[in-house]
Amino acid sequence: MLPEPVSCPDWLIAQEAEKRMKSIFQLAEELDIKKEELIPYGSYIAKIDYRKLYSRIKNNPNGKYIIVTAITPTPFGEGKSTTTIGLTQGLGKRGKKVSCAIRQPSAGPLMNIKGSAAGGGLSQCIPRTEFSLGFTGDINAVMNAHNLAMVALTSRMLHEANYSDEILKKRGLRRLDIDPKRVQMGWVIDFCVQALRKIVIGLGGKKDGITMESRFDIATSSELMAILSLVKDLKELKKRISSIVVAYSKTGNPITTEDLEVSGAMSALMLPAFNPNLIQTIEGQPVFVHAAPFANIAIGQSSIIADMVGLKLNEYHVTECGFGADIGFEKFWNIKCRTSGLKPDVAVLVATLRALKYHGADKDSPKIIPGNPLPKEYIEKNMQWLERGMKNLFHHIKIIKKSGLSIVVCINKFQSDTHEELDFVRKFCEEMGIPVAISEHWQKGGQGALELADFVIDACKNNSNFNFLYENSLPHISRIELIAREIYGADSVEFSPLALEKLQSINSKKEFSDFAICIAKTHLSLSDNPLLRGVPEGWQLFIRDILVFYGAKLIVPVAGEISLMPGTASTPNFRTIDVDLQTGKVTGI
């Protein structure tokens, strides 16, 4: 028996579960992955040799494809990863061959306030510590490849400043005439560091680089991470990397990684990360872990490759997308599925009573501050707040319905939830013909997710009418306005002069016609203002800038005050993470 989640922290439950987990070879054998298709990282973690495996299984029929999303979360999150793992365990309890795909946790949120993305309670993936602390090095590979592009750029700028055309020619170089004011990329690091959002580099002498403004972004927002999420084979990975625009010349020509002759080396650094990772739930179901982009500042999806493998090997494959349906699901729907060609069967919409009450609370209600205990007002029964908060749930239901998918609502149950509140939510959804599972997977594991699993199995029997929100023939400005209106609930969109100028240039060029819209926006509100709860009315989405990711083929409108480099809070997790000197194990994750 595993410890009770109510009285035991997640990391201790994980350590106990790890004493009896399957070897990676047993897990692979049960999945029909051959030994020669595994790249082991010890006894319980492996990478899959994707090229070997997929060439063998590509003609297998696809299993049922389930996407897990959520309502607008509180700063604590509402247990989407936990539900993804819990549902996988529940389907396993029902005798189904099942896997799930999740993203690798970034060290930034792990050491800050969000913690690990390993799930919690009795619905976790293991080994938890290794998963949480670097894993197999994929984020480092992305970080190193990204920063190598910046090394190539800044060193080239220095050499062009110091050497004549004749000397450059002797060294096999042509003058690119890079404009230091039009460098598109910054550096990346896998931490949340507000002090690195705006920096100046090259402050030394003639040999120390060109003096210019620069920045650090968090590694998970790198264009390379989006590329890792979206590619389907090695050829595509290399092609997309070579298309990344790092800067512009003084005459306005794009400078790519290919121009800098660094795309091959970047591909070499990314090569190990190309293969998906395999671990397990605490009940022994397979978990694919691949890619790590956030949904608010990036694409927010685990990789297409992980889903392709999971679908070919299993009857059911569960994948999760970041944050709420307004950003994570919208990007899954209109970017990931359009790129992959895969069509999901069912969407699971996760909600909690605390989040619903948060969205329906009075204006003077207590703030939820990450790192601080949840105010008791959101734990205690409050039918008035709950009823008002249902507007947020209804809005997310409407978003998913626009995709044509069947929906199962999952109430991620907490011990403080009352029967009256749970019955109210169930009745609300059932009146719309939507099944609602009251799921206790956090406390009871797969056994607590059986109702959810049963509803999902039934929903998978329906024919999917999945369709996209927009066609690529629609101008990019119109796509942004459509997402703002139909998904976020905005009245209109205001573009800054800079954003409008960039969009007009983009719309005039055919090369951008199939670039997807990937809006960077706060996850804490349907609007671009994180303080607006519920379903804001009478508001305008403000787009302050437009980023273009040529390799990932994404147009990224930046909404409101969102930053590509989060900051570290005053109560970060790193203060409670340590090493037990007697056991040699990490504590506090």
Curated annotation (Swiss-Prot):
Pfam families: FTHFS. CDD domains: FTHFS. Pathway: One-carbon metabolism; tetrahydrofolate interconversion. Its EC number is 6.3.4.3. It comes from the Bacteria. Keywords: ATP-binding, Ligase, Nucleotide-binding, One-carbon metabolism. The keyword Protease does not apply. SUPFAM superfamilies: P-loop containing nucleoside triphosphate hydrolases. ATP binds at residues 74-81. It catalyses: (6S)-5,6,7,8-tetrahydrofolate + formate + ATP = (6R)-10-formyltetrahydrofolate + ADP + phosphate. Belongs to the formate--tetrahydrofolate ligase family. This is Formate--tetrahydrofolate ligase.
